[in-house]
């Protein structure tokens, strides 16, 4: 069983000074990368910029300290932006803090209950669908700032479709100076990564922030900056408790579950990616506990939800980080930056922030995979993918995940039902199968039905479609291909037994698997049928039928 022990405690046994130096360098570089991203993601989430830094500092440190991965870097991520903005708009900061606290508790419970491996049962089409949907909502949400639009609205625009409608409605208010800053910032973000040599060591988002801020300040451009719209604080984060009310808890509980699921999916996915880069193996349940503790800490210090960030984790590895020390250094570095440089964040133009978030959205939305799935996946998977994507954009992430999982479950059961068969004996020529049906002689007045596939509630009705001929006195059910049965299937078997009993037909079971045998034993079905009528092999079952006939 996987140990609930932080990776930090394991790696410190063989820690060296050389690795410490590498971890410190990697941590500082990742902090520089995380700074503009944390600010941008905080603004996209509808909160003040320093709250993104608070999150990276508090949650980042705790998750690195307690986490189940050697190199995970945690902080605010784009996946949470839309849901956080919705919570803040509807329930205020107190609602967000309560939702994040509840999500943290849920994550810790998931870890202690060792549910880390259950995340794999969330279909790839759902994660791809909502990730692409989030990317589109972020993109639409940033058009206003990128173009410098002046949107007049009586109420805050929360829904993505309302924001898109407002963009078209107020497109005539485009600020050309803001658009110029946005386009130049976006070009820097795109081109910088292709420049040779030392340029690749400097995060393009940092260059975009410096160039955009310099343009607006030196050219005295009429462009909104962070300082024009938000009051920025460089104060250290302090513990603050929200005003709890039962109504608020009820309102944000669905959001808390969504945050917990998102945090679990994204953090464990990041761990898997990191494992392949450093040839290590993460502890998924310990990682969930750390994610929970990190989110609780972030909420108490005024931050927003956090999870493992794949891009920052990859940057950590590429720059030499190999232990959780790098993640902790990243948080300490951001703390120093908060105190010293945060006032200068007021100079960052909003179009530059929008450009950074455009790139975040583009990197999130792997459209090649999306299109590839639409071309190659089964129809049922395409339905789940497109439905989750559309619901994320049109409604919100909570609805998308709930409906997506429900739809995926229903379609999965439909697929399983389709492969489950209950059919009469067919004589086929199959020389390769020593168990071939064609090699058996069926006794007179005996029916043989082969049951294939799992017998669960979606397919259990096929048992009742067996035609009972009153001229027969034995019904052999060959169950060698039945891997599992559930309560509904067991109920239908009981009904079949009752129908057979009325017509004086004896049921004989052949080759019953371990799980079905256990269920039949517990339900008393074996005693009803008669244990002497439960045979290990089809030959034994046919011989038994011949004796009864």
Give the location of each predicted region.
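Transmembrane helical cores of multi-pass ion-transport proteins
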Residues: 1-426
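Short, contiguous clusters of charged residues that form electrostatic/catalytic patches at enzyme active sites
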Residues: 26, 186, 190, 461, ...
């Amino acid at each position: 069983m996987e140990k609930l022990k932080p990776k930090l405690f394991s790696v410190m046994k063989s820690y060296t000074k050389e690795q410490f130096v590498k971890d410190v360098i990697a941590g500082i570089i990742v902090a520089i990368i995380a700074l503009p991203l944390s600010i941008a993601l905080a603004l996209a989430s509808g909160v003040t910029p320093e709250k993104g830094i608070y999150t990276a500092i508090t949650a980042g440190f705790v998750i690195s300290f307690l986490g189940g991965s050697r190199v995970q870097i945690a902080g605010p991520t784009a996946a949470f932006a839309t849901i956080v903005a919705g919570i803040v708009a509807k329930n205020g900061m107190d609602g967000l803090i309560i939702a994040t606290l509840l999500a943290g508790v849920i994550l810790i419970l998931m870890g202690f209950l060792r549910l880390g491996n259950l995340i794999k049962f969330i279909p790839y089409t759902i994660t791809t669908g909502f990730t692409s949907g989030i990317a589109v909502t972020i993109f639409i949400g940033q058009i206003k700032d990128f173009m410098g639009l002046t949107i007049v609205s009586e109420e805050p625009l929360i829904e993505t479709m309302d924001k898109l409608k407002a963009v078209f409605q107020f497109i005539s208010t485009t600020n050309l100076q803001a658009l110029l800053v946005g386009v130049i910032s976006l070009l820097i973000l795109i081109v910088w990564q292709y420049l040779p040599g030392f340029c690749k060591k400097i995060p393009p988002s940092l260059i975009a922030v410096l160039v955009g801020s310099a343009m607006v300040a030196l050219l005295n451009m009429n462009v909104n900056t962070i300082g024009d719209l938000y009051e920025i604080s460089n104060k250290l984060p302090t513990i603050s408790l929200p005003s709890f009310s039962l109504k608020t808890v009820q309102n944000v509980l669905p959001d808390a579950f969504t945050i917990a699921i998102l945090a679990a999916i994204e953090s464990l996915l990041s761990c898997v990616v990191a494992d392949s880069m450093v040839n290590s193996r993460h502890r998924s349940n310990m990682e969930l506990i750390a994610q929970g503790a990190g989110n609780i800490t972030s909420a108490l210090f005024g931050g927003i939800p956090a999870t493992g960030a794949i891009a920052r984790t990859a940057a950590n590895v590429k720059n030499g980080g190999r232990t959780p020390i790098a993640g902790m250094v990243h948080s300490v570095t951001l703390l120093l930056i908060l105190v010293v440089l945060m006032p200068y964040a007021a100079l960052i133009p909003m179009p530059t922030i929008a450009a950074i978030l455009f790139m975040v959205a583009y990197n999130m939305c792997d459209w090649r995979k999306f299109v590839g799935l639409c071309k190659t996946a089964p129809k049922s998977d395409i339905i789940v993918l497109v439905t989750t994507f559309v619901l994320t954009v049109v409604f919100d992430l909570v609805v998308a995940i709930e409906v997506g999982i429900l739809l995926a479950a229903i379609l999965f059961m439909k697929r399983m039902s389709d492969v489950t068969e209950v059919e009469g004996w067919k004589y086929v020529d199959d020389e390769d199968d020593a168990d071939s049906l064609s090699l058996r002689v069926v006794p007179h007045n005996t029916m043989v039905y082969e049951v294939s596939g799992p017998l669960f509630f979606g397919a259990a009705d096929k048992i009742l479609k067996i035609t009972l001929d009153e001229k027969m006195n034995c019904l052999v059910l060959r169950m060698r291909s039945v891997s599992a049965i559930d309560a509904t299937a067991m109920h239908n078997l009981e009904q079949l037994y009752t129908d057979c009993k009325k017509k004086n037909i004896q049921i004989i079971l052949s080759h019953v698997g371990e799980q079905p045998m256990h269920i039949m034993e517990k339900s008393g079905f074996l005693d009803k049928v008669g244990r002497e009528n439960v045979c290990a092999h089809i030959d034994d079952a046919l011989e038994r039928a011949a004796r009864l006939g």
